[in-house]
């Protein structure tokens, strides 16, 4: 009975604290209105609920059956978000709760509450996040995190067709804009009625804090400019990053680079990503200590990491900003033909930085990862980008998250790895592989040559381990200075050029 499901959702709101007992009748009536129902029959006995996903499915199935909601994956997501939006407190209440906890209990208590809240509202869909495949691979650079992302919804054919027919809109300008808060969504833009953001001031400018709905790692947050302004790595970027970790010292925060290929998927809206997680790069030791003249008070060095990373640590955050700006300025204009590093070609700039900030033992710390997006006929997607032989696993941009040591791999790999596992166990000749596995053929032959012991019992851990080592190669390809004698000498030449 649909009245039972409505009461279950009301009870869920009460149990999670999204609504208060005084709100019960009002919220129930708002849910009835959203469902386009006029009647409610109170359940005869106390209503218990199993899980939120089941409650929402019952309600959406009913709405679809009555023609209130279209029957495709996107329309269903739009509708169940509308239902959760009824339970979600208004922004002013959420912000007041956050600020009260921040002032009285501290920054971690505030983010703990906001992270749970963002899950309770179903903005972060816990039941989808659980579907992601995750494991750790031990490498020469530490333990790399690998995930095959299954929680980001893939549109079904009906939803894709509907999105093509949907009228185009420039509001909100992108999925990061503050105007998404409370937005109902459409076939080509996700619903955000259950989405709330926390205003922040960093570097005397208006920014906001939210969580990523896809949670690639613990407390994966997004910090974004209140204005729809493009990504730009500059002196002010370092100031903003350090201001943020000053406000939330338990979180790290970093920025994608500001150039295509080496940047993230969204270059049009200035934003950072952070969270409560320690990546392999953060754990990596200093390989070579370096002292910058005039900055003897700043601990500096090259990190033992496949991507070219300079680590700076100092109790005085302004000194870090000053030195980081010098390094950025030097790198923007730096060329070294022997390492195939060119600051620009045909007027197109190539050099930039992926910066990450954190607090370490009471001091401020910046990791500056040197990036270059030059392309050639041999490497049309980028010289310092995963090379073609690795594209069967990872072809996409190497953004901030990958730079730090977490591979976010496409969902297609789940099915392909299951099929490849069967083919490997049965020793199927690669020439007989189906078309979708052909891209893995050379890799599969190499795996079998190195793992003659491969069988049905160990094939899956072996494949996971091999994927992890491919990711280590991906990071090596993306590093501008290789971890060999020539690369190390080239890195030292650049550091010596910073004045």
Which residues does each predicted region cover?
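Active-site microenvironments that recognize anionic phosphate/pyrophosphate groups
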Residues: 1-223, 227-230, 304-306, 320-324, ...
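Short alpha-helical interface elements
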Residues: 171, 266-270, 278, 294-297, ...
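Helical scaffold of the NTase/Pol beta-like nucleotidyltransferase catalytic core
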Residues: 194-198, 226-253
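Histidine-centered divalent-metal-coordination microenvironment in nucleic-acid enzymes
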Residues: 219-225, 263-279, 369
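Hydrophobic faces of well-ordered beta-strands that scaffold small-molecule active sites
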Residues: 209, 253, 270-272
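Catalytic or ion-translocation cores adjacent to nucleophile or general acid/base/metal-coordination motifs
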Residues: 236, 245, 249-265, 274-328, ...
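Beta-rich nucleic-acid/ligand-interaction surfaces
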Residues: 260-268, 346-352
């Amino acid at each position: 009975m649909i009245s039972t499901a409505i009461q279950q959702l009301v009870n869920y709101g009460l149990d999670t604290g999204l609504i208060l007992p005084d709100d019960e009748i009002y919220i129930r009536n708002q849910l009835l209105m959203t469902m386009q129902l006029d009647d409610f029959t109170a359940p005869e006995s106390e209503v218990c609920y199993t899980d939120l996903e089941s409650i929402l499915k019952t309600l959406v199935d009913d709405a679809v059956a009555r023609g209130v909601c279209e029957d495709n994956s996107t329309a269903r997501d739009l509708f169940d978000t509308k239902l959760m939006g009824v339970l979600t407190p208004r922004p002013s209440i959420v912000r007041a709760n956050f600020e009260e906890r921040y002032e009285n209990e501290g920054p971690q208590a505030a983010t703990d509450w906001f992270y749970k809240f963002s899950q309770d509202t179903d903005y972060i869909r816990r039941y989808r996040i659980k579907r992601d495949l995750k494991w750790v691979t031990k490498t020469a650079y530490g333990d790399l995190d690998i995930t095959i992302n299954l929680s980001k919804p893939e549109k079904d054919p009906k939803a894709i067709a509907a999105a093509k027919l949907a009228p185009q809109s420039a509001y909100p300008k992108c999925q990061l804009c503050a105007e998404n808060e409370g937005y109902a969504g459409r076939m080509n833009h996700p619903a955000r009625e259950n989405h709330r953001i926390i205003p922040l001031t960093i570097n005397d400018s208006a920014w906001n804090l939210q969580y990523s709905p896809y949670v690639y790692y613990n407390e994966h947050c997004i910090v974004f400019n209140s204005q729809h302004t493009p990504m730009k790595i500059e002196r002010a970027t370092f100031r903003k990053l350090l201001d943020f970790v000053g406000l939330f010292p338990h979180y790290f925060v970093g920025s994608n680079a500001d150039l295509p290929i080496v940047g993230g998927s969204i270059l049009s809206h200035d934003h950072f990503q952070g969270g409560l997680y320690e990546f392999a790069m953060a754990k990596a030791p200093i390989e070579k200590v370096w002292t910058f003249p005039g900055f003897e008070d700043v601990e500096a060095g090259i990190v033992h990491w496949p991507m070219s990373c300079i680590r700076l640590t100092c109790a005085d955050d302004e000194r870090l900003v000053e030195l980081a700006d010098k390094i950025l300025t030097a790198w923007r204009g730096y060329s070294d033909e022997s390492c195939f590093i060119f600051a620009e070609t045909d007027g197109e700039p190539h050099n930039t930085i992926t910066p990450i900030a954190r607090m370490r033992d009471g001091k401020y710390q910046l990791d500056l990862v040197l990036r270059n997006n030059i392309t050639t006929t041999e490497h049309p997607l980028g010289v310092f980008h995963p090379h073609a032989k690795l594209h069967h696993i990872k072809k996409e941009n190497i953004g901030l998250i990958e730079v730090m040591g977490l591979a976010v791999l496409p969902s297609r790999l789940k099915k392909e790895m299951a099929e490849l596992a069967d083919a490997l166990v049965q020793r199927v000749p690669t020439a007989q592989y189906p078309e979708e596995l052909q891209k893995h053929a050379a890799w599969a032959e190499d795996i079998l040559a190195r793992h003659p012991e491969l069988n049905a019992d160990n094939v899956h851990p072996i494949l996971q381990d091999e994927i992890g080592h491919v990711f280590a190669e991906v990071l090596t390809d993306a590093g501008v200075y290789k971890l060999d004698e020539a690369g190390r000498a080239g890195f030292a030449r650049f550091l010596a050029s910073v004045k």
